[in-house]
């Protein structure tokens, strides 16, 4: 194994687009349209329209930074350039410690769709989730060229199913289903928009892969723009299908899109819906496992993570030490879930605040680093304001990044003390 060598540039434009889509288009597309419709009725489409417009600055703020400063550290690197190495390393650890929990949650969510559709129990759910995590780790170990190709295939399958679900919904869409337009008042539209925000972040994850882009300037900006448009259209069409058919009333708010998919397919509908959940969550895992392993590698390269996290595979030039760390974390989280010590409801709250803080750090860095571009600063400021407004809603999940900060500060203090003693 090699240590601290450069990563290979193997990610082209199609792979970059697929990785961006996979990072952002999570399992929320199956659940959130129904929840938003239940909350605000047909007026939820206004919230979707607003968030579809906001998606471009959210995406471009990360794309512009990735194009200008391609680095495996991603947001951590941007914050380092803007605010210093310690701030950058702390943000890097926020992201790194989010994925060991977030990826198993995504796997259990995706596996849950399939087991619910097929009537399987919790052991099958855990086994499927473990398989999804293994796929995510293996594809990233073999390399981003392979991971990118796998991601393209998975994303094509996801898009095909979502487009099919919209087509299947068309015959059942009626004008009467759009009235009354705002049955719960206009305030409910704002409340729905707050929930929808979580569906439109994730662009920061792929910034950690920018060092492996063949053409960072092109892949980061053009790739993220294309991906943002695709994601925005898919989310809006899914919401339109949900409202137009009133499936959130027939199939339940949390399974409205699954109800639409199952209607024209009969007995096969549940299986296809479950498979869609698996595909969507596997795409998310591939993107985030790749991002987390790269940020761990970058932190090790800077001396802010153990040296073994910087080990590269001799064969594939991928961060095998960091991938091993993720494998251990995934095993621990699945074991805790399987033993009943932690529920998926508890697990899902932990990474919320750390993901948002990572995004806030990246947007703040963009305001400082993109000063040569008025558009870049404006985009970064809009994204910063939007994410900062949502942060208070993370609630007690703020305790997780607070714990990470305390541990980071303690380790940094001990390292500084040891360095001072050594200098004497």
Residue ranges and their predicted role:
Residues 29-33, 110, 139-145, 174, ...:
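Transmembrane helix-loop junctions in multi-pass membrane proteins
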Residues 49-50, 117-144, 156-166, 199, ...:
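Transmembrane alpha-helical segments of multi-pass small-molecule transport proteins
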Residues 2-7, 45, 49, 118-124, ...:
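Helix-loop-helix junctions that connect adjacent transmembrane segments
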Residues 77-79, 84, 116-120, 225-288, ...:
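TM-loop-TM module centered on a large, flexible mid-protein loop between adjacent transmembrane helices
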Residues 1-34, 38-43, 47-49, 55-56, ...:
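Membrane-interface "cap" regions at the ends of multi-pass membrane proteins
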Residues 1-4, 80, 106-129, 212-216, ...:
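Helix-loop-helix connectors at the membrane interface of multi-pass transporters/channels
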Residues 35-39, 47, 56-133, 137-141, ...:
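Hydrophobic transmembrane alpha-helices that form the core helical bundles
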Residues 364-424:
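A generic transmembrane alpha-helix motif of multi-pass inner-membrane proteins
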């Amino acid at each position: 194994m090699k240590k601290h060598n450069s990563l290979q540039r193997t990610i082209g434009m199609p792979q970059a687009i697929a990785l961006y889509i996979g990072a952002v288009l999570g399992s929320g597309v199956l659940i959130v349209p129904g929840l938003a419709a239940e909350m605000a009725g047909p007026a939820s489409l206004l919230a979707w329209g607003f968030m579809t417009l906001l998606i471009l600055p959210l995406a471009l703020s990360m794309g512009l930074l990735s194009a200008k400063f391609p680095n495996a550290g991603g947001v951590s690197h941007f914050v380092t350039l803007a605010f210093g190495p310690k701030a950058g390393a702390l943000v890097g650890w926020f992201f790194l410690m989010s994925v060991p929990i977030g990826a198993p949650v995504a796997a259990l969510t995706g596996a849950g769709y399939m087991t619910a559709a097929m009537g399987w129990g919790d052991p099958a759910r855990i086994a499927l989730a473990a398989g999804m995590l293994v796929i995510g780790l293996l594809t990233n170990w073999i390399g981003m060229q392979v991971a990118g190709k796998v991601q393209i295939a998975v994303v094509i399958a996801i898009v095909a199913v979502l487009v099919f679900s919209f087509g299947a919904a068309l015959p059942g869409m009626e004008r009467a289903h759009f009235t009354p337009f705002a049955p719960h008042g206009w305030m409910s539209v704002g409340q729905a928009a707050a929930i929808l925000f979580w569906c439109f972040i994730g662009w920061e994850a792929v910034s950690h892969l920018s060092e492996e882009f063949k053409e960072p300037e092109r892949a980061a900006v053009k790739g993220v723009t294309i991906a943002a448009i695709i994601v925005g259209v898919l989310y809006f069409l899914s919401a339109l299908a949900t409202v137009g058919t009133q499936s959130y009333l027939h199939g339940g708010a949390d399974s409205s899109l699954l109800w639409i998919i199952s209607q024209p397919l009969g007995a096969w509908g549940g299986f296809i819906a479950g498979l869609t959940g698996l595909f969507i969550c596997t795409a998310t895992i591939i993107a985030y496992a790749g991002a987390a392993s790269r940020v761990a590698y970058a932190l090790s390269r800077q001396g802010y993570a153990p040296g073994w996290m910087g080990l590269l595979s001799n064969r594939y030039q991928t961060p095998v030490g960091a991938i091993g760390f993720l494998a251990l974390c995934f095993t621990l989280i699945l074991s805790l879930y399987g033993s009943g010590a932690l529920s998926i409801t508890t697990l899902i709250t932990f990474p919320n605040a750390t993901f948002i803080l990572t995004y806030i750090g990246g947007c703040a860095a963009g305001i400082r680093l993109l000063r040569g571009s008025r558009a870049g600063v404006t985009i970064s400021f809009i994204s910063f304001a939007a994410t900062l407004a949502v942060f208070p809603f993370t609630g007690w999940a703020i305790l997780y990044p607070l714990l990470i900060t305390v541990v980071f500060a303690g380790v940094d203090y001990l390292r500084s003390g040891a360095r001072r003693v050594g200098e004497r």
